[in-house]
């Protein structure tokens, strides 16, 4: 059995397309946070893997939103990707890491809150069948 590193896995584009923009950015947030934490801890292997996964999620998000009526979302996704990559490759990590992490963390909180609200709504529907 061949063991693959986690960075060899790619997001399922069909399943990814079913998610909302906020869910996309919330999931990207997790990889951004992992990359920043790994960088701060000096773990280059984990940092590289998290960056690789984040790039894959950014690419999948661009694929979803390009050519749609909501393609205005692309500007934000592409700008966020550029800022994330600049953080690791332009030598500005110390100055910008907290701001970039904070930006993405807001999406993570929003995505989690929306998921929680959907779960509560489903519980209400199942608790009161036949009522809206």
Say what each PLM segment does.
Residues 1-132:
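Surface-exposed peri-terminal alpha-helical interaction modules
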């Amino acid at each position: 059995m061949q063991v693959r590193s986690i960075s060899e896995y790619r997001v399922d584009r069909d399943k990814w397309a079913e998610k909302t923009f906020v869910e996309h950015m919330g999931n990207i947030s997790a990889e951004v946070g992992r990359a920043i934490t790994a960088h701060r801890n000096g773990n280059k292997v984990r940092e590289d893997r998290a960056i690789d996964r984040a790039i894959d999620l950014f690419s999948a998000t661009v694929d979803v939103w390009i050519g749609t009526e909501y393609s205005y979302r692309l500007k934000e996704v592409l700008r966020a990707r550029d800022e994330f990559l600049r953080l690791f490759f332009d030598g500005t990590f110390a100055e910008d890491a907290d701001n970039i992490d904070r930006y993405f963390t807001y999406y993570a909180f929003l995505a989690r809150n929306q998921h929680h609200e959907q779960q509560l709504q489903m519980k209400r529907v199942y608790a009161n069948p036949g009522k809206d």
